[in-house]
Amino acid sequence: MNVLNRRQALQRALLNGKNKQDAYHPFPWYESMRKDAPVSFDEENQVWSVFLYDDVKKVVGDKELFSSCMPQQTSSIGNSIINMDPPKHTKIRSVVNKAFTPRVMKQWEPRIQEITDELIQKFQGRSEFDLVHDFSYPLPVIVISELLGVPSAHMEQFKAWSDLLVSTPKDKSEEAEKAFLEERDKCEEELAAFFAGIIEEKRNKPEQDIISILVEAEETGEKLSGEELIPFCTLLLVAGNETTTNLISNAMYSILETPGVYEELRSHPELMPQAVEEALRFRAPAPVLRRIAKRDTEIGGHLIKEGDMVLAFVASANRDEAKFDRPHMFDIRRHPNPHIAFGHGIHFCLGAPLARLEANIALTSLISAFPHMECVSITPIENSVIYGLKSFRVKM
């Protein structure tokens, strides 16, 4: 199967799963798959799907058995660190880690708090607002823009780019797939050109931002090339926008949905880190990851052959009854909480500390600012690779 056909097969397999589930409440489908077909094979598209915690963790984390490297066409995000195997992954990761140390993240905490407070002030006098549009979307976009060292004036364009890069075709028709790939390729060309210009500026005039750190960072005497930096910047833009936006929205929805939790967090803000971890488990922003088998291996009594494509449903694993007590309950005091919402192994999410920091500040500040809040309405994102809300209206 060639590169394009592999990409299309994965998209079709994801759409097959999406069509069997409610956009924001896929959990009954996950539960039925864990019970009836924990390792299933899509004959039409030649793609495996795994749903149990131990199986998902193995597929996602075992670098000897499963590869993240899928040959891409001209794709900046496709050529980023998430789609690399060692030794190239090791080299890139060791360099970019320098931009995400606890010390670097700690330096950004006051600014993230400042941005959060400024956003809350804009809607503090209203009786109702859209939590996504007014808060959980702009906050991560502004933060990641400043972290990368690019003007936040590009915020709307950033959102358009990142939305497109995580989108999927409207349906399984050849026309829809062709139009989707053409639009996505155009988007990636625009992003690559944009970041190439920013990187050149930082080489000539470095500042206190992540791109400058990466431009200056050296590993065994080598600096990262533009070809290595551009995909990583694209990945940061997309992950920094989509994942954190959906984490904040999903967390607040879960908090409001569960009686007494909002009031408990208002009285005990020290519980917020645990609440964020539980939100990651309960409503994972990235519900599915994909891998390719590097050699023949057995999972759940099924032979997965070398070269087979596998979809690992992280959101299902995080609700596996064999791993979590009362998995369908949102419990902010859950301990331990070994969720795998940020992945596992060498591809554990590099931006996890930033996402956690933003979510903790955002949710604590929101709950502190409003003595009462309730959900008015939600509109889910119709997408098979990300999980979140397009709109989330709340009233105070």
Swiss-Prot record:
Disulfide bonds: none
A Pfam family it matches: p450
Sections of the chain in a coiled coil: none
Listed EC numbers: 1.14.-.-
CDD domains from the UniProt entry: P450_EryK-like
Domain of life: Bacteria
Database matches in InterPro entries: Cyt_P450, Cyt_P450_B, Cyt_P450_CS, Cyt_P450_sf
Annotated binding of heme, by residue: C349
PROSITE patterns from the UniProt entry: CYTOCHROME_P450
Necessary cofactors: heme
Keywords linked to the UniProt accession: Heme, Iron, Metal-binding, Monooxygenase, Oxidoreductase
GO MF assignments: heme binding; iron ion binding; monooxygenase activity; oxidoreductase activity, acting on paired donors, with incorporation or reduction of molecular oxygen
Family, per entry: Belongs to the cytochrome P450 family.
Designated name of the protein: Putative cytochrome P450 YjiB
Species assigned in the record: Bacillus subtilis (strain 168)
